[in-house]
């Protein structure tokens, strides 16, 4: 495959889902071909400012207020429905906050652990080793706040290890096959 994974990041502060939906439906999904639902992730960034007003984000808990969560879930439902109606493809968008620090104010990330888990899970096992070797933030606050629907940090580690073990197994198998060219002793060494 030429493209393993497409991550579509939608600006949560915009009301215009039509442009993103059109891009997903008319360009991205047709380009992905088979099993495109396994190779596309849709994430709405800036969830903290998606809904306007003072009741949009609980700064103390660093999570959406109940009103904001309803608003974001409606946005996700609309996006899912529009993509499904146009392509018959079921996607599972998420919302998150990347976080920022501008010198005066700081917004901690939210749901980044979930986004990373989904990226790793949608990446072919044999390519997860590359992600495991990548430099990810070591600040625990980056991965702390999420929707608590799962232990995304542990599940990400498990997925990465699954990819590493799978790659080691495949490498050993390949080595044995190459070694067989030199007889049974070569196969054992390979």
List each model region and its residues.
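Membrane-inserting effector segments that mediate pore formation, membrane fusion
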Residues: 155-190
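Conserved GTPase G-domain substructure that encodes guanine base recognition and part of the catalytic core
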Residues: 1-166
